[in-house]
Design a protein with these regions (language model features):
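Amphipathic alpha-helical packing segments from all-alpha helical-bundle domains
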Residues: 99-106, 119-147, 158-165
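Short, hydrophobic secondary-structure boundary micro-motifs
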Residues: 112-114
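Hydrophobic/aromatic-rich alpha-helical bundle segments in the mid-to-C-terminal region
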Residues: 141-194, 203-205
Length: 205
């Protein structure tokens, strides 16, 4: 009986996910992946020309989806009138993170690969990219506050980077720990409240 179309590729992907999750990209063995998938090396190279290409096939779309969702939220917030930005500060970010949580929760193994197993690939910097976007957005928001007459102190860039990095790592920890989605959603809401209050204090609001 002929195999369903795509079954070989499905086996390669399943074996690759297990191998990358267990060992990370750098230590993962392409030979083990091929063996576990029950395919020949020639069959593998009919789909991918390298281990890196295989890893990219597993994570590229989700990786880019997260960045685009976050970027869209930032641009949407900045499209608001300055006065609206003040009233919506914190809420837009929490809404975005809840959306990302649902998306990432449905793909936990993939995001464990991205967050814990991607060293040595172009996909190892998800948190760094999110931090860069958030730091730039925070600085622009401070300028909005100043344009409205608020006396916002200059924030030390080192402190700003540490705070944003801590925030992004905290959000990602929710994905890395196995917990019911409802619990994760509550934690994300509470994290949002915590960091919003902290930023308001630092910004003198």
């Amino acid at each position: 009986m002929p195999q369903p179309i795509g079954s070989t590729l499905d086996r390669i992907h399943a074996a690759a996910r297990d191998e990358f999750l267990a060992k990370g990209y750098q230590a993962a063995s392409l030979r083990n992946i091929v063996k576990t998938a029950g395919v020949t090396t020639g069959a593998f190279y009919g789909y991918y020309d390298s281990k890196e290409a295989l890893f990219a096939a597993l994570v590229d779309e989700p990786y880019r989806r997260v960045l685009e969702t976050y970027r869209t939220a930032v641009f949407g917030f900045e499209a608001l009138r300055p006065e609206e930005q003040v009233t919506q500060m914190g809420q837009v970010g929490k809404t975005c993170m809840q959306e990302l949580l649902v998306y990432m929760d449905a793909r936990r193994p993939v995001f464990r690969l991205i967050l814990q197993g991607a060293e040595g690939t172009p996909y190892a910097g998800l948190i760094d990219e999110l931090v860069a976007m958030e730091v730039a957005a925070t600085e622009r928001y401070c300028e909005v506050l100043r344009s409205l007459g608020s006396a916002v102190p200059q924030i030390d860039p080192r402190l700003e980077h540490m705070l944003v990095t801590g925030m992004m790592n905290a959000y990602c920890e929710v994905i890395l720990h196995d917990m019911p989605l409802a619990d994760a959603q509550r934690y994300v809401e509470e994290l949002g409240d915590f960091y919003t209050a902290g930023w308001l204090k630092i910004m003198g609001q």
